[in-house]
């Protein structure tokens, strides 16, 4: 277990914020990779921490201090990223908190221009459960995490200043957190109500009974245009995709109705092939939307 006063910068002494509800290492949280304090970084970090005030103080363990806070995009498959287009930035937005013991991830959602709020999702991985943690890339830095259970995740769209800071801090933190590997050996989801570790694919907390949205219901929502996105709370994406899907569905139904009740055309292929093509596009669109939504469901979305 790493000491809360573990030195990160050779040029600065450890400094923990006094008299605060959160224990923050000011020498790390508010400085750049060279250890020089940046007022703009302090202001941005304070704003981020204030928006996590509902959950972060509850998550922190005794002798656990906040070292650094930064934003990133959560892991997502290239196909889903291509399918979502520019919506992917809101879909995968996440806040990561580096402490002396672990890396915390908080799922967030946008609230207007440059505003966001915590979206009831919290995950955690201890440094002992990481077989490797590297920052890769220059123009578009990524945080690549290799877990002891064999899984790998990439958090992308890091700011360069954050990437430099992580390159400095992560080796020291991993070197000083060499405890036993947990049963999961990787990132785990925590119940936002009681903070118990949640079991993958079990959508009820065994400790407090909190119920979460599940994959079975998500599949039923596929029957509604844009329903998969509405189910996971992505309403703006759901409205856009729902409109497109509704138009495609109406086109197929209109052709089918005309074929059944109207005059049949001499060349059936001229009707069947375009209709089948639209139906195929509709199905592919639904399947492509299902996978990123299923990923959110597997990160546990509480039922109110």
Question: Which residues make up each language-model segment?
Answer:
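Canonical pleckstrin homology
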Residues: 93-94, 120-123, 127-177
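Transmembrane helix recognition focused on a "late"/terminal membrane span
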Residues: 139, 143, 161-221, 240-304
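Anionic N-terminal interaction surfaces
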Residues: 2-96
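A short amphipathic helical element positioned immediately N-terminal to and/or at the very start
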Residues: 219-231
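Conserved long hydrophobic alpha-helices within structured protein cores
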Residues: 65-68, 93-106, 239-245
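Membrane-interface helix starts
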Residues: 230-241
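Beta-strand residues in well-ordered beta-sheet regions across diverse protein folds
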Residues: 99, 106-107, 146, 206, ...
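Phosphoinositide-binding peripheral membrane targeting modules
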Residues: 75-142
């Amino acid at each position: 277990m790493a000491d809360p006063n573990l030195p990160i910068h050779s040029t600065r002494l450890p400094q923990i914020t006094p008299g605060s509800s959160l224990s923050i290492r000011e020498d790390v949280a508010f400085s750049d990779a060279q250890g020089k304090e940046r007022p703009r970084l302090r202001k941005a970090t304070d704003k981020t921490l204030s928006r996590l005030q509902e959950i972060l103080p509850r998550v922190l363990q005794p002798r656990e201090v906040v070292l650094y806070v930064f934003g990133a995009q959560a892991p997502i498959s290239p196909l889903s990223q291509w399918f979502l287009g520019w919506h992917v930035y809101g879909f995968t937005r996440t806040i990561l908190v580096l402490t002396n013991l672990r890396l915390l991830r908080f799922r967030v959602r946008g609230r207007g221009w440059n505003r966001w709020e915590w979206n009831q999702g919290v995950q955690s991985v201890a440094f002992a459960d990481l077989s490797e943690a590297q920052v890769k890339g220059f123009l578009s830095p990524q945080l690549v995490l290799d877990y002891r259970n064999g899984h790998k995740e990439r958090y992308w769209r890091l700011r360069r200043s954050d990437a430099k800071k992580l390159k400095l801090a992560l080796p020291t933190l991993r070197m000083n957190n060499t405890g036993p590997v947990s049963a999961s050996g990787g990132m785990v989801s925590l119940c936002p109500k009681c903070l118990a570790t949640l079991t993958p694919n079990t959508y009820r907390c065994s400790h407090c009974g909190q119920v979460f949205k599940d994959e079975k219901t998500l599949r039923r929502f596929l029957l509604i245009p844009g329903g998969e996105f509405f189910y996971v709370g992505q309403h703006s994406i759901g409205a856009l995709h729902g409109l497109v899907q509704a138009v495609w569905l109406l086109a197929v139904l209109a052709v089918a109705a005309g074929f059944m009740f109207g005059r049949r055309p001499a060349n059936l292929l001229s009707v069947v092939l375009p209709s089948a093509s639209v139906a195929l596009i509709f199905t592919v669109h639904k399947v492509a939307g299902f996978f990123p939504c299923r990923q959110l469901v597997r990160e546990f979305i509480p039922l109110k």
